[in-house]
């Protein structure tokens, strides 16, 4: 049986860094589902798709997202840093509330996670994508801590951003993601919650690895 590790939580909770390290330490695959919502968000915004439209299916027909060795390809072209901007994050969050977008990406994600050892991170992994995951983690941290992390991350990448704007964007995205009707950001009843506000990345990774060894003892 495969060992599937679901890591969910709000923007800046440390999901991406932690999930990547856990996958690396265990030597298994890693899936960043937020990247997929960013890809679709950018695609739809470039096409001028109205988020309130009853159907977005036509816009998604010509979009082929592939995932190979931890990298995404859109219609054969590798995806780069363009999906990491704050705007791409906002588009992702806006279009992620649309049922057609969720159906489109959930189907691909379920397929990627099928019968394979994987760490998948996002907002609805433990509730929708892998509801029967062997290990479910829900990471939390205060909005200020999360905004500070995102701020330093963006500055390091050369973006000229203000802390206050990053904090506002984080709070806005939290609201979009928690209040939407379909697959909102929420903790699965059987998920283990970890508050990362005062923990180092290594401490969080160690806690998760310990849980994985308990639940998937025959593999690791
Ligand atoms: O994780 P990241 O911040 O890159 O995700 C960008 C956006 O994609 C989130 O704010 C959320 O709206 C959406 N998302 C989602 N479900 C997921 C992953 C991301 O709705 N599983």
PLM region spans:
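ATP-dependent NMP and nucleoside kinases share a basic, alpha-helical "lid"
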Residues: 83-92, 96-157
């Amino acid at each position: 049986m495969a060992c599937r590790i679901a890591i969910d939580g709000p923007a800046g909770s440390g999901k991406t860094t932690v999930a990547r390290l856990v996958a690396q330490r265990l030597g298994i695959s890693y899936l960043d589902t937020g990247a997929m919502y960013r890809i679709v968000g950018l695609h739809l915004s470039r096409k001028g798709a109205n988020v309130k439209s009853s159907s977005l299916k036509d816009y998604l027909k010509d979009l082929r997202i592939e995932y190979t060795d931890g990298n995404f390809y859109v219609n054969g072209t590798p995806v780069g840093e363009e999906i990491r901007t704050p705007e791409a994050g906002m588009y992702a969050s806006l279009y992620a509330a649309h049922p057609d977008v969720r159906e489109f990406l959930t189907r691909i994600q379920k397929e990627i996670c099928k019968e394979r050892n994987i760490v998948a991170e996002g907002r609805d992994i433990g509730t929708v994508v892998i509801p029967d995951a062997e290990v479910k983690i829900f990471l939390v941290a205060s909005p200020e801590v999360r905004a500070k992390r995102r701020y330093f991350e963006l500055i390091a990448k050369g973006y000229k951003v203000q802390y206050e704007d990053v904090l506002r964007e984080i709070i806005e995205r939290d609201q979009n993601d928690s209040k939407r009707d379909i697959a909102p950001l929420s903790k699965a009843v059987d998920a283990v919650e970890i508050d990362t506000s005062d923990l180092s990345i290594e401490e969080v990774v160690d806690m998760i690895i310990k849980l994985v060894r308990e639940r998937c003892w025959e593999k690791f």
